């Protein structure tokens, strides 16, 4: 192993150790070891895998800190892999010299406004384990082309400026796993994907929290932006995704360009998460084939779930709950707008206030077709439980509507306005027989 202090690094937090660390990269044996201390960098250390061969960076069990005192990433790892993950497409040099560069048990702290953590480009099997990155503009940055990225047991925390924790930017990437990590306190996004071609992105067992900017617009804990590029085949599972209110902010935001068939983004599963405390908890826009199952939603200050211009969205077994122990001017509820082939099944809507707004219900469906609302329970919601406007060929069936806390009953538990054909409302239950089931204006009356 190559101890950077053997190459002249001081690790005293004052000396510029950049030259010594670069010397260790170029002349060492490939295992770059930082013992206890604080190592100051003033420029990026480039690890060119074609030249160095297989490489690993270790911080001696987390005892070492690298402080980036200049702009750009502290470490830039560059490989030559230009193919896919198909074993037949590899050049020999990738397996012989470049595969699986590893960072483990080390802290990187930014002390420059443009400092970043680690950047990977052209790399096969980049692996991060037990890495702490703080106060960086970008924590982990993947660009151009990478394959089989793995990040586990990491802390990407307290980003600088409009920071991003993990940024997949302009990258062609297949097989990426972000597992068991804390990614928190970045003002723009915890995890962001943009201008990329990505397949197989798994985000599981993570705490992705407090990535928000109360004074800025458009931020998210997890933001998959396919308005340029395509991102498909992804999972967000067993995570806590939580923030505070931001203008236009979302906990999870997956969006594509306004294409007729919503093809740019999709084939996603969002399951078993706690998702709460933002303007919108979950925003799906111009995507298709997304499954949303077994999640707990809370404190959607504008809405819990918004589905816009989407196709083939299946959402089942989720809760929107109002816990009296929680404070905040939440609205909660769901909007489905301009979409086709949407299933809302087995939800619980508790004390949702979205129906206080004109033309809205706890669940509002607008200008959509082939929507099924079934097996849901609506308790103590303000106004209508289900508002249908310009909806065609859809079902509202087998639901329970009621007041458990008393209070004024709505004009109708289900309201249908602005026309629409082939809408059927049937087999629903009013608790205690209270209230009117259906109010229909302007169009074919639904059946009750």
Where are these predicted regions, by residue range?
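N-terminal extracellular ligand-recognition/capping segment immediately after the signal peptide
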Residues: 8, 18, 26-56, 60-72, ...
């Amino acid at each position: 192993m190559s101890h950077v202090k053997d190459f002249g690094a001081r690790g005293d937090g004052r000396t510029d150790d950049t030259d010594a660390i670069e010397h260790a990269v170029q002349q060492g044996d490939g295992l770059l070891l930082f013992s206890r201390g604080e190592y100051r960098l003033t420029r990026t250390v480039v690890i060119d895998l074609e030249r160095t061969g297989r490489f690993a960076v270790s911080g001696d069990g987390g005892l070492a800190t690298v402080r980036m005192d200049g702009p750009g990433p502290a470490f830039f790892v560059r490989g030559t892999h230009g193919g896919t993950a198909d074993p037949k497409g590899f050049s020999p040099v990738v397996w012989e010299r470049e595969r699986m560069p590893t960072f483990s048990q080390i802290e990187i702290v930014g002390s420059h406004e443009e400092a970043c953590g680690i950047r990977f480009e052209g790399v096969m099997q980049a692996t991060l384990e037990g890495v702490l990155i703080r106060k960086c503009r970008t924590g982990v940055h993947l660009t151009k082309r990478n394959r089989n990225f793995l990040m586990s047991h990491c802390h990407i925390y307290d980003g600088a400026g409009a920071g991003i924790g993990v940024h997949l930017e302009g990258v062609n990437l297949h097989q990426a796993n972000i597992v068991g990590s804390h990614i928190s306190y970045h003002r723009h996004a915890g995890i962001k994907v943009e201008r990329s071609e990505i397949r197989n992105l798994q985000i599981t067992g993570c705490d992705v929290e407090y990535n928000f900017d109360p004074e800025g617009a458009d931020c998210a804990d997890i933001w998959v932006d396919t308005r340029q590029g395509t991102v498909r085949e992804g999972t967000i599972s067993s995570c806590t995704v939580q923030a505070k209110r931001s203008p236009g902010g979302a906990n999870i935001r997956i969006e594509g360009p306004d294409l007729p068939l919503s093809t740019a983004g999709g084939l996603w599963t969002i399951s078993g998460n706690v998702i709460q405390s933002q303007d919108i908890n979950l925003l799906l826009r111009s995507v298709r084939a997304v499954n949303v199952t077994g999640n707990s939603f809370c404190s959607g200050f504008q809405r819990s779930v918004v589905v816009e211009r989407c196709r083939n969205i299946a959402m089942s077994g989720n809760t929107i709950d109002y816990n009296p122990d929680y404070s905040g001017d939440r609205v909660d509820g769901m909007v489905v707008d301009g979409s086709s082939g949407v299933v809302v099944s087995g939800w619980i809507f508790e004390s949702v206030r979205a129906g206080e707004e004109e033309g809205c219900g706890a669940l509002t469906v607008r200008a959509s077709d082939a929507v099924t609302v079934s097996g849901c329970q609506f308790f103590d919601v303000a106004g209508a439980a289900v508002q249908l406007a310009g909806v065609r060929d859809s079902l509202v069936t087998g639901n329970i509507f009621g007041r458990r806390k008393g209070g004024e009953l709505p004009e109708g538990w289900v309201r249908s306005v602005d026309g629409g054909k082939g809408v059927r409302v049937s087999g629903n239950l009013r608790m205690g027989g209270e209230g009117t089931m259906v109010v229909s204006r302007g169009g074919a009356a639904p059946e009750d």
